[in-house]
Design a protein with these regions (language model features):
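Catalytic cores of the polymerase beta-like nucleotidyltransferase superfamily
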Residues: 1-186
Length: 186
C-alpha cells in the first residue's frame, strides 16, 4: 500500500509543479469546433445538457494549459450516443462499451465519450457499473475532486466537490476514502 501511495504522490508532484494561471476559464472549450459539433448532435434544444466536458480537459482549461485529450460525459447510454452520431462525419470506436465508453473521431480529433455511471460492485480496477442520468452519482465514483469538474459547451461549470478551488490551491483531495480509491486504481 505504501508503494502505491508513493507512486500516486510522484504523479501528483509532477502535475502540481506546473505554474497555474487561475485567470483562465472553461470558456475556451467552446472554441473546439469538433466538440461543438458533437455537442450539437447530442444535446436536445431547450432541454438540460446531456453531454459535458469532464476531467483533464476542464482542469487544463482552468489552468491555461494546452488541451490535448478530451473526455466527455453524457447522460445517454452508449447505444443512444452511437445512434445519435451515426450517419454523421464521425468515426465511432467501441473503446470500452461494457463500461460505457466509446471514442468519437472527428477531423482526426479523438473524444472519449462515457455514459454517466454508478458502481454496483468493484474489484480493484474492475467495476460492474450501472448507467445513470445522475451527474452527482457519476462524480462520486471519480478519484479526485479535480477530476469531478464538468463543463458544458458554454463554459458553465458543474463542480459538486469544489474541485476548482482544490485545483487553484494546489491540493489533491480524494472523493471518499483515499485508501479505497487507491485500491480501485491498482
Amino acid at each position: 500500500m505504501k508503494k502505491k501511495i508513493n507512486n500516486i504522490i510522484l504523479k501528483i508532484d509532477k502535475f502540481f509543479y506546473r505554474k497555474f494561471k487561475s485567470d483562465k476559464s472553461t470558456k475556451v472549450l467552446e472554441n473546439i469546433k469538433e466538440a461543438k459539433k458533437i455537442f450539437s448532435y447530442i444535446n436536445v434544444p431547450g432541454e438540460e445538457d446531456k453531454i459535458k466536458f469532464v476531467g483533464g480537459c476542464v482542469r487544463k482549461a482552468m489552468t491555461g494549459e494546452f488541451i490535448d485529450d478530451i473526455d466527455l460525459a453524457t447522460s445517454f447510454e452508449p447505444k443512444d450516443i452511437k445512434l445519435k452520431l451515426s450517419n454523421k462525419d464521425i468515426k465511432i470506436i467501441d473503446t470500452g462499451i461494457e463500461h460505457g465508453t466509446i471514442t468519437a473521431i472527428l477531423n482526426k480529433k479523438k473524444f472519449e465519450i462515457t455514459s454517466l455511471r454508478s458502481d454496483i460492485s468493484t474489484d480493484g480496477r474492475h467495476a460492474n457499473v450501472q448507467f445513470t442520468s445522475d451527474w452527482n452519482k457519476d462524480a462520486t465514483r471519480r478519484d479526485f475532486t479535480i477530476n469531478a469538474i464538468y463543463s458544458d459547451i458554454q463554459g458553465r461549470v458543474f463542480d459538486p466537490f469544489n474541485g476548482k478551488s482544490d485545483l487553484l490551491d494546489g491540493k489533491i483531495v480524494f472523493i471518499g476514502s483515499a485508501e479505497e480509491r487507491i485500491q480501485e486504481d491498482y
